[in-house]
């Protein structure tokens, strides 16, 4: 495990200097989920949520969040993203339904896009919660995690279990 690089000689936080890092294609995939009641599932899949098309709004929110990551996370570098994609799928559980959210972010640059993918997935989930909370505040968000990342000096990472 490498040492932390976000501290200066005085032990204070700093933004890491990435000037000399090589530009490479970098991709990160993150996942999260929102577990909802049957009522919310039925209304979402029939586009009957009063606030509108939940998945369409969540998708746009996720893309916007990826682009704003550096504004939210203090030592995150502002990046020129080349692509952001959000995918949704449903998993049925015993007495609930799980919306699985997958965010994929891509760039060509000198630092990775893991935080952008995690932020995109998280804001998607928060948007789903916001749009459905009038029906049930008991929705569960998470877990949220990095599935895979490619590019850069540290190379390829793939989560062992997904």
From Swiss-Prot:
Family matches, as CDD domains: MoaC_PE
Reactions the enzyme catalyzes: (8S)-3',8-cyclo-7,8-dihydroguanosine 5'-triphosphate = cyclic pyranopterin phosphate + diphosphate
SUPFAM superfamilies named among the record's database cross-references: Molybdenum cofactor biosynthesis protein C, MoaC
UniProt GO BP: Mo-molybdopterin cofactor biosynthetic process
InterPro entries: MoaC, MoaC_bact/euk, MoaC_sf, MoCo_biosynth_MoaA/MoaC, Mopterin_CF_biosynth-C_dom
E.C. no: 4.6.1.17
Active site: 130
Coiled coil regions in record: none
Top-level lineage group: Bacteria
A single MF term (Gene Ontology): cyclic pyranopterin monophosphate synthase activity
Keywords in alphabetical order: Lyase, Molybdenum cofactor biosynthesis
Range of residues in the leader sequence: none
Pathway in which the depicted protein is active: Cofactor biosynthesis; molybdopterin biosynthesis
Annotated binding of substrate, by residue: 75-77, 115-116
Subunit details: Homohexamer; trimer of dimers.
NCBIfam families per the UniProt record, alphabetical: moaC, PRK09364.1
Function: Catalyzes the conversion of (8S)-3',8-cyclo-7,8-dihydroguanosine 5'-triphosphate to cyclic pyranopterin monophosphate (cPMP).
Protein family (similarity comment): Belongs to the MoaC family.
Stated name of the protein: Cyclic pyranopterin monophosphate synthase
Organism: Geobacillus thermodenitrificans (strain NG80-2)
């Amino acid at each position: 495990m490498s040492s932390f690089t976000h501290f200066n000689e005085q032990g204070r936080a700093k933004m890491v200097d990435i000037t000399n890092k090589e530009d490479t294609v970098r991709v990160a995939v993150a996942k999260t989920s929102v577990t909802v009641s049957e009522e919310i599932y039925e209304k979402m899949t029939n586009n009957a949520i009063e606030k509108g098309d939940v998945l369409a709004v969540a998708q746009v929110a996720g893309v916007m969040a990826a682009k704003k990551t550096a504004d939210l996370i203090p030592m995150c570098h502002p990046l020129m993203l080349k692509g952001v994609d959000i995918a949704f799928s449903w998993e049925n559980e015993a007495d609930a339904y799980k919306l699985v959210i997958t965010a994929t972010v891509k760039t060509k640059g000198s630092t990775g896009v893991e935080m952008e993918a995690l932020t995109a997935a998280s804001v998607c989930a928060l948007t789903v919660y916001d749009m459905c909370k009038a029906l049930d505040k008991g929705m569960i968000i998470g877990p949220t995690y990095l599935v895979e990342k490619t590019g850069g000096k540290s190379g390829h990472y793939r989560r062992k279990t997904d």
